[in-house]
Amino acid sequence: MNFLAHLHLAHLAESSLSGNLLADFVRGNPEESFPPDVVAGIHMHRRIDVLTDNLPEVREAREWFRNETRRVAPITLDVMWDHFLSRHWSQLSPDFPLQEFTCYAREQVMTILPDSPPRFINLNNYLWSERWLVRYRDMDFIQSVLNGMASRRPRLDALRDSWYDLDAHYDALETRFWQFYPRMMEQASRKAL
């Protein structure tokens, strides 16, 4: 899962959106640095990552990547799940339009920005103003996201080529998304994530 899915599942679970978004920027035990609700959100994010990586649908999808891109498949798939969530948002969350949800999420996250790591602050400078969560629905933007990550982290250069794996297996990936994401939504609503 990437930014949109973590925020969405956090909302459904009535968990801290701030903590769920911040989690990838926090190493080790967050309890000394953040308030309890944010810490709970960080822990939820980490549980979701482990759960998602071990889903049979996701493990199967990783196998569809070529040898040269399989190492970055987990990252590529996380971004792709956000694509499908953004694309099908009106079906999955009909009572909370994506643009409104994005504004709501931004308001929640802004409350912790002053005490956040610099890399997280930098992300927020772009995430909201460039409307990433809404733009995830466009595959051209997904390609741009993957290229951007590859540019910032040379060891992840294979992300550029992983675009072709997404394109080649688009329909099958979408099917897998529909197989697991509604289950995760239900688990989040029961606070079981």
UniProtKB/Swiss-Prot annotation:
Q: Which reaction does it catalyse?
A: holo-[ACP] + H2O = apo-[ACP] + (R)-4'-phosphopantetheine + H(+)
| Biological process, per Gene Ontology | fatty acid biosynthetic process
Hydrolase as a keyword of this entry, yes or no, is yes
Cross-referenced InterPro entries: ACP_PD, ACP_phosphodiesterase_gpbac
Q: Does the keyword Iron apply?
A: no
Enzyme Commission number:
3.1.4.14
Output one GO MF annotation.
Answer: [acyl-carrier-protein] phosphodiesterase activity
Q: Which NCBIfam families match?
A: PRK10045.1
Q: Which family does it belong to?
A: Belongs to the AcpH family.
User: What role does it play?
Assistant: Converts holo-ACP to apo-ACP by hydrolytic cleavage of the phosphopantetheine prosthetic group from ACP.
Q: Which UniProt keywords apply?
A: Fatty acid biosynthesis, Fatty acid metabolism, Hydrolase, Lipid biosynthesis, Lipid metabolism
Q: What protein does this entry describe?
A: Acyl carrier protein phosphodiesterase
